[in-house]
């Protein structure tokens, strides 16, 4: 799949995940603010957050049993792995595995 199409698909899935998180759990204000700062480029926002090892959101999702909504869970999906450096995919895999996420 063409990389720009893949990025758009990832962005759309991130937006849907955020909507569901807002509805069911909490408002990820920092992430939403960063999306605006990066012109809705979720790939770049994620690279920044994962590189900083931000864990607040994933911890809240873990507490509610909703790790499948995490950005980390999106990143490790086979179709999106090529959008990210292997180091970021590995960090996300380790975080999720540590929390017992079964889709790895």
Predicted ranges, named:
Residues 17-66:
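Amphipathic alpha-helical packing elements
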Residues 9-13, 31, 40, 48-55, ...:
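Intrinsically disordered, charged low-complexity linkers and terminal tails
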Residues 2-23, 97-98:
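Charged, compositionally biased N-terminal leader segments and the immediate start
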Residues 63-104:
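Amphipathic alpha-helical binding modules
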């Amino acid at each position: 799949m063409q990389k720009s199409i893949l990025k758009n698909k990832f962005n759309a899935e991130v937006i849907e995940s955020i909507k569901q998180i807002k509805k069911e759990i909490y408002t990820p204000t920092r992430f939403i603010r960063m999306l605006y700062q990066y012109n809705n480029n979720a790939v770049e926002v994620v690279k920044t957050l994962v590189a900083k090892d931000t864990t607040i959101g994933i911890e809240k999702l873990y507490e509610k049993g909703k790790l499948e909504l995490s950005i980390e869970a999106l990143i490790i999906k086979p179709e999106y792995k090529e959008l990210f450096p292997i180091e970021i995919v590995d960090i996300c895999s380790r975080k999720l595995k540590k929390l017992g996420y079964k889709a790895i």
